[in-house]
Design a protein with these regions (language model features):
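Ligand-recognition elements built from short beta-strands and adjacent flexible loops
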Residues: 1-103
Length: 103
C-alpha cells in the first residue's frame, strides 16, 4: 500500500480547508459613508475591502440609484465599525439636493 500520495492528498485538503476558513474571517473597519456621494461611498467601501454593496432609495419612492454622483448617502447598514469583509453593506440614499429623511 502506498501511503505517500494519500498522505499528501490529505495534507493538501486540510491546508485548503484551513485557508478557506481563515479567508471568511478577514475583517476591516467600515468607514462612515454618510454625507458622501453614492459613488464616493462605494469607492471608499471597496477600498476598505467590502464587495457586497447595495443602494436603496431612502425616501422609499422605489427609485433606482443609477448614477452614483447624483445621489447622497443618508445612512448605512451596518454602521461604521469593524466587520468581516463578507458583510453586506446597504447605503440608503437620496438624490443630490434632497433632504435625508428623519430617523
Amino acid at each position: 500500500m502506498r501511503r505517500g500520495p494519500a498522505l499528501l492528498t490529505l495534507a493538501v485538503v486540510i491546508a485548503l480547508l484551513a485557508l478557506s476558513q481563515h479567508a471568511g474571517k478577514q475583517t476591516a473597519p467600515l468607514p462612515d459613508l454618510r454625507g458622501r456621494t453614492l459613488r464616493a461611498a462605494q469607492l471608499a467601501a471597496r477600498d476598505a475591502g467590502f464587495r457586497q454593496l447595495a443602494a436603496a432609495d431612502a425616501l422609499d419612492r422605489h427609485r433606482v440609484p443609477v448614477l452614483g454622483g447624483n445621489w447622497k448617502v443618508c445612512s448605512q447598514q451596518p454602521p461604521p465599525a469593524r466587520y468581516a469583509l463578507t458583510t453586506p453593506v446597504t447605503l440608503r440614499v437620496v438624490k443630490t439636493g434632497e433632504a435625508c429623511p428623519r430617523r
